[in-house]
């Protein structure tokens, strides 16, 4: 789910991140991006 995506995100400060994107899509969202080192899912 979405929360596990955030936990997983050791990602860059901004921008696209593959693992985060994949996780968000599995959670039913359109995409995932990084905001301040955290994964953010975009519905």
Swiss-Prot record:
GO molecular function terms noted in the UniProt entry: potassium channel inhibitor activity; toxin activity
Record has Disulfide bond as a keyword: yes
Record has Phosphoprotein as a keyword: no
Key words, A-Z: Disulfide bond, Ion channel impairing toxin, Knottin, Neurotoxin, Potassium channel impairing toxin, Secreted, Toxin, Voltage-gated potassium channel impairing toxin
Compartments, record wording: Secreted
Highest taxon of source: Eukaryota
Cysteine disulfide links: 5-23, 11-34, 20-39, 24-41
Main location: secreted
Tissue spec: Expressed by the venom gland.
GO cellular component terms listed in the entry, alphabetical order: extracellular region
UniProt family annotation: Belongs to the ergtoxin family. Gamma-KTx 4 subfamily.
Domains (record comment): The presence of a 'disulfide through disulfide knot' structurally defines this protein as a knottin. Has the CSalpha/beta fold, which comprises one or two short alpha helices connected to anti-parallel beta-sheets stabilized by three or four disulfide bonds.
Protein's job: Reversibly blocks Kv11/ERG potassium channels.
Protein name (Swiss-Prot/TrEMBL): Potassium channel toxin gamma-KTx 4.13
Gene source species: Centruroides noxius (Mexican scorpion)
């Amino acid at each position: 789910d979405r929360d596990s995506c955030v936990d997983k995100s050791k990602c860059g400060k901004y921008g696209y991140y593959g693992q985060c994107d994949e996780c968000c899509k599995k959670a039913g969202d359109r995409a995932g991006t990084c905001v301040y080192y955290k994964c953010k899912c975009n519905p």
